[in-house]
Amino acid sequence: MKTYQVDKNGYYGEFGGAYVPEILHQCVENLQNTYLQVLESDSFKEKFDQLLRDYVGRPSPLYLAKRLSEKYGCKIYLKREDLNHTGAHKINNTIGQILLARRMGKSRIIAETGAGQHGVATATVCALMNMECIVYMGKTDVERQHANVQKMEMLGATVVPVTSGNMTLKDATNEAIRDWCCHPSDTYYIIGSTVGPHPYPDMVARLQSVISEEIKKQLLEKEGRDHPDYLIACVGGGSNAAGTIYHFVDDERVKIVLAEAGGKGIHSGMSAATIQLGKEGIIHGARTLVMQNEDGQIEEPYSVSAGLDYPGIGPIHANLSVKHRAQILAVDDDEALEAAFELTRLEGIIPALESAHALGALAKVNFKPEEVVVLTVSGRGDKDMDTYINYKLS
């Protein structure tokens, strides 16, 4: 049977793999040899499920958005990842990875963060497990997501502002990898998305797959069937999208729509529409689609959303795109901002700017009245209030 899941060598079609400096070979190989044994063990599953239930507050609701549904002429359910502890889907992954890190005997945790949500989720589980935590964050993002920086510091993490390059997510990831190279024996790197060398894209997708597992059960209760007609999610690196589609990716009855950041317009030179603009290349240890110039130098991405301005894309999504399994839509800054205000006014839910890109895709698809659409609200909008207020003032 045709599958879009990872193969035994860590590839999704031609994308994926592990391209790492020699100093990290041993680290990455240990992780490759260990992660499935741990993730599939009964003791891990029991602890992971217990923490998701009692600490994160799962299952997250599947909410029928009636007024939004009326507007777009179909049945729209919102998967409410914004209601998780820490306000986004990121905690699903950090809880799983910190349990794995402890099993591997690591004592020091590092992470990269863009919008700060993964940083907060990592600092949170480090506080929970009493482990040292260092978070790398681009200086640009430190300034635009200051509330999350304060949360991380309150949780006991050291936040390191990164001043190289564009001073955003890509640069923070580079610094985290440098740190890992210097401390391979005692340090575990919790990557926040379905990016990086194998096994990270698969591991993060598996840990986030609790989202699609719940969607199946919840739809069965609400609609009498376990699959929607459409799944819609935003993609930066792609972890909330990977979790949303995980149990449906091989079910051709389900259409997949991925919304990437169009920035100021896909041809403006100020965008993060990696799938549509990228060419095959290697970034942060994985072969995937990368925004690059003629000489193969990585181009600086741009998005109003700090969580989506990444110049690569998870290899799972690169593969879904080239195989035409997913429809890729670029949603620009203004479309996302308008969609955020629309959801707020229609349903009383203020979404994260990242999630607003998924909402912005609704206007670009023609739905039929009987179709069931599940859209993942990956996070809540608290961290983006300054951007929202400034947008309305302008």
From Swiss-Prot:
Signal peptide positions (record): none
Pathway: Amino-acid biosynthesis; L-tryptophan biosynthesis; L-tryptophan from chorismate: step 5/5
Highest taxon above the source species: Bacteria
InterPro entries: Trp_synth_b_CS, Trp_synth_beta, Trp_synth_beta/beta-like, TrpB-like_PALP, TrpB-like_PALP_sf
Catalytic class of the enzyme: lyase
Cofactor: pyridoxal 5'-phosphate
Chain positions found as N6-(pyridoxal phosphate)lysine: K90
EC number per UniProt: 4.2.1.20
Keyword Amino-acid biosynthesis: yes
GO molecular function: tryptophan synthase activity
Catalysed reaction equations from the record: (1S,2R)-1-C-(indol-3-yl)glycerol 3-phosphate + L-serine = D-glyceraldehyde 3-phosphate + L-tryptophan + H2O
GO CC annotation: cytoplasm
Function field: The beta subunit is responsible for the synthesis of L-tryptophan from indole and L-serine.
Family according to the record: Belongs to the TrpB family.
The protein's name in its UniProt record: Tryptophan synthase beta chain
Upper classification of the organism: Bacteria, Pseudomonadati, Bacteroidota, Bacteroidia, Bacteroidales
